């Protein structure tokens, strides 16, 4: 088992979710392999680390893979990529057969519904001869619909450091904003990871009741190559939870209004 829940997310975000889950009565064990599974009549027994349990159901959520078998790809002249599992496509979703396009879980990068949808738009436009732009795979939003929600785009703090960036971080609690109190968002935070020299937003991470809605303005800012400096001067409506994004940008330089 992995060392933290939500292993693809920033460490600070995962800590918030773990804390909230524990308050909800959920037991969390990380870094402990599930072993000695025994399926009985109406229950499942297993061990994890130095503990054991008997439960009604055991769900193994180890991810999913593309189902490309039986599609007749070879006969159609459609090749798989280096993994031998996913369909090889170019930036416009075109396969090695110029008349065939592929999108979504069958091709590269993350298996996300919103990614597949946008790839479908690109494929149709390209096939129809219209001008189009490839999907920016670096700006794909991760959206986890737990309670609280988790949303992220770009690099985590650890990834940015590993990539050699000198960084600054801005964090703001949603509860610090008036709307955070109104909507009873006591645990949520917005975290920005930015390049120290130029202000580029390298990663944006949110946990909160409406995180998956709040992330959109950060994706737009990053796509338009705006820095945290520009974001910190954009007037946000009051009182809204979106003000947390504004204060997170200001927190990078230590002047969040509602810190």
Indicate residue ranges for each PLM-predicted region.
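Glycine/Thr-rich phosphate-binding loops of Rossmann-like dinucleotide-binding domains
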Residues: 6, 54-55, 67-70, 110, ...
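Short beta-strand micro-motifs enriched in acidic
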Residues: 39-40, 81, 193-197
């Amino acid at each position: 088992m992995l060392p933290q829940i939500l292993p693809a997310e920033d460490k600070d975000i995962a800590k918030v979710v773990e804390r909230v889950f524990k308050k909800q009565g959920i037991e969390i064990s990380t870094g402990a392999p599930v072993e000695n599974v025994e399926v009985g009549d109406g229950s499942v027994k297993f061990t994890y680390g130095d503990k054991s349990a008997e439960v009604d159901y055991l769900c193994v959520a180890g991810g999913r893979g593309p189902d490309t078998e039986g599609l007749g790809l070879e006969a159609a002249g459609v090749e798989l990529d280096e993994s031998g599992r996913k369909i090889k496509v170019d930036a416009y979703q075109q396969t090695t057969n110029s008349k065939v396009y592929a999108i979504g879980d069958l091709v590269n990068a993350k298996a996300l519904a919103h990614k597949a949808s946008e790839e479908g738009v690109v494929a149709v436009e390209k096939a129809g001869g219209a001008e189009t732009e490839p999907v920016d795979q670096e700006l794909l939003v991760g959206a986890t619909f737990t309670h609280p929600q988790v949303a992220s785009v770009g690099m985590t703090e650890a990834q940015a450091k590993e990539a050699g960036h000198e960084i600054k971080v801005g964090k703001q609690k949603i509860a610090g904003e008036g709307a955070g109190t109104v909507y009873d968002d006591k645990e949520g935070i917005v975290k920005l990871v930015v390049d120290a020299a130029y202000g580029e937003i390298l990663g944006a991470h949110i946990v909160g009741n409406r995180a998956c809605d709040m992330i959109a303005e950060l994706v737009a800012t990053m796509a338009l190559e705006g820095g945290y400096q520009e974001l910190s001067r954009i007037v946000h409506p009051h009182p809204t939870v979106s003000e947390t994004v504004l204060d997170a940008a200001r927190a990078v330089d230590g002047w969040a209004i509602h810190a």
